[in-house]
Amino acid sequence: MKTLLLTLVVLTIACLDLGYTKTCFNDDLTNPKTTELCRHSVYFCFKNSWIAGGVERIERGCSLTCPDIKYNGKYIYCCTRDNCNA
């Protein structure tokens, strides 16, 4: 009986995947790239890029939603895998 209970507990923990946290790149133009651990409920990594004053600007990080706004030449990319916003 104890073996069955232990097996059920192990399977429950494995199925819930407790403690998983998404990681996303969070730098601007630094090299090497740095990462951040996103909050538990965050599903997206994002990358915003645009031209300002003739220089390309880049912003990366974690996001709760995937913004679909592209205005004034701003490009927004979202993804759901770890470190996919390179």
Swiss-Prot record:
<feature type="signal peptide">
    <location>
        <begin position="1"/>
        <end position="21"/>
    </location>
</feature>
<keyword id="KW-1015">Disulfide bond</keyword>
<dbReference type="InterPro" id="IPR003571">
    <property type="entry name" value="Snake_3FTx"/>
</dbReference>
<dbReference type="GO" id="GO:0090729">
    <property type="term" value="F:toxin activity"/>
</dbReference>
<feature type="disulfide bond">
    <location>
        <begin position="24"/>
        <end position="45"/>
    </location>
</feature>
<keyword id="KW-0800">Toxin</keyword>
<dbReference type="Pfam" id="PF21947">
    <property type="entry name" value="Toxin_cobra-type"/>
</dbReference>
<dbReference type="InterPro" id="IPR045860">
    <property type="entry name" value="Snake_toxin-like_sf"/>
</dbReference>
<feature type="disulfide bond">
    <location>
        <begin position="66"/>
        <end position="78"/>
    </location>
</feature>
<dbReference type="InterPro" id="IPR054131">
    <property type="entry name" value="Toxin_cobra-type"/>
</dbReference>
<feature type="disulfide bond">
    <location>
        <begin position="79"/>
        <end position="84"/>
    </location>
</feature>
<protein>
    <recommendedName>
        <fullName>Neurotoxin-like protein pMD18-NTL3</fullName>
    </recommendedName>
</protein>
<feature type="disulfide bond">
    <location>
        <begin position="38"/>
        <end position="62"/>
    </location>
</feature>
<keyword id="KW-0732">Signal</keyword>
<dbReference type="InterPro" id="IPR018354">
    <property type="entry name" value="Snake_toxin_con_site"/>
</dbReference>
<comment type="similarity">
    <text>Belongs to the three-finger toxin family. Short-chain subfamily. Orphan group IX sub-subfamily.</text>
</comment>
<keyword id="KW-0964">Secreted</keyword>
<dbReference type="GO" id="GO:0005576">
    <property type="term" value="C:extracellular region"/>
</dbReference>
